[in-house]
């Protein structure tokens, strides 16, 4: 009996450290469950974020469409009523809110933008003149930015295609270009300094061409030279500062919204608003 007892109590003792290293089966289940639950939460959170981004993008496109629809029947601002201007302003502010405060990307800004609407008096007056004068037409109006490789400024060209139908081709008989350099003064404000006004790309109509060089007669060297001179004619008028040391004529321009296909701007000081859409590159 003593031997049995001795044999029993002489068995090796179980180490406490070994016991502690053994994880209960139930605890492993809970740990794995927590891991799976965390993964599910992360996936669900990612899917929710993606849906929010998509919803925001769709909402933005709808708001941009609403803005373009609001300006559609205003003849680029010429015939806009006070009620229409209020609706347009509200739509403008809504779109501006989608990327308000973001830095302007010069790569996106670079290129040609076609005017869809403006309330700027110095542009609307051109449309008014064209509506009243039968011998004067205003075609497309563009802003052309050259700033891809710069972060502090660049060149901006305001381009107006116009015509005298009795002498020039319809809508695109000639091009008026107002060139300015601009400096970036804040994340969205740029200061324009106008440098030059030019008239170029003169395209006379067929009737005038026939008068200068009739098709039924051999075209003389003089008539051909005259046609070539008209086509390549370019008149330039510099816009200089009124006195040494002062800036040339200019103004502050606030770029209130920019993406790949829409540009919104405001001329600071009550000079009007502008709605542009991206256009094909314009060669000048």
UniProtKB/Swiss-Prot annotation:
Keyword Transit peptide in record? yes
Q: What is this protein's record name?
A: Probable plastid-lipid-associated protein 10, chloroplastic
Q: Which is one Gene Ontology cellular component term of this protein?
A: cytosol
What family classification does the UniProt entry report for this protein? Belongs to the PAP/fibrillin family.
Report the transit peptide positions.
1-40
Where does the UniProt annotation place the signal sequence? none
Q: Where does the UniProt annotation locate this protein?
A: Plastid, Chloroplast, Plastoglobule
Main location group: plastid
- By its UniProt entry, which InterPro entries does this protein fall under? PAP (IPR039633), PAP/fibrillin_dom (IPR006843)
Its keywords, alphabetically, are: Chloroplast, Plastid, Transit peptide
